[in-house]
Amino acid sequence: MIESATSNPFCSRFLQPGRIPFCFPGTESISQLADRIRAPLGKGAPRGNSAQAALRLSIVGPHGSGKSTLLHQLCQELRGNRQSNCLSDSGLVVLHSSSNKLAALRAILGRIHRDQWCLIDGYEQIPRWAQFLLVAWAKPRGVALCVTAHRLPWMFQTLWETRVDAHVESHVIECLLANVAAKDGGPSSVISDLLQSPHWAVSRQKHQENLRESLFAMYDWWQATVDDFPRSR
């Protein structure tokens, strides 16, 4: 049995977008993607249709694959503060199925009116007619739109396509368990135990690309496997 003095690392507060750095497979970086959003605003930017198309960029991928995390970190990068809370600072607009669509539309139009870019998490929650309105409102103002979606939206280009593989899984687990002070071999032992556990294998098989749900499912594994941590979520 592993011992730890930390709270359960799989509780919801540790899995909020932006808490874990996005994992890039190669040499790409947050700053490079942010530059693509900034590009049409700088000197020497292309003119004509290609420039307008570049103003509409989308992060595309399945549920729980890191889209919101990437957009949150892009928000921090664009604001020049990687420690900022983009939600409380109104750095981006987050939409859910239960969101008030009219209120959200007003918030987005307000951002387009006053800012150089507008970031929208959950673009597919906006009705198609409202999507047309946002594009038409942003285009003549030169405002960059960057959104998350499960499929590439009409009139958008792909900024990034999120994928989940073994490398991403290990990165996320290592970040979550970085502060675990385990007596039986340290964090690496905990990571190995988790990744080799039947519970993890079953969860990954069940949730496939949705890594977020697999991580939530490991809350019970941690509670049953790890001693001496607060049993409150």
Residue ranges of predicted features:
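Conserved P-loop NTPase "ATPase switch" module shared by AAA+ and STAND
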Residues: 98, 108-137, 144, 148-151
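Amphipathic alpha-helical "lid/sensor" segments that cap RecA-like P-loop NTPase cores
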Residues: 192-233
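Conserved small helical "lid"/interfacial subdomain of P-loop NTPases
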Residues: 165-197
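A conserved segment at the C-terminal end of the G1
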Residues: 72-79
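AAA+/P-loop NTPase substrate/partner-engagement loops
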Residues: 81-113
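A short, basic N-terminal segment
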Residues: 1-53, 217-233
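Short regulatory helix/loop adjacent to the ATP-binding pocket of P-loop NTPases
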Residues: 152-164
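Walker A/P-loop nucleotide-binding motif
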Residues: 51-72
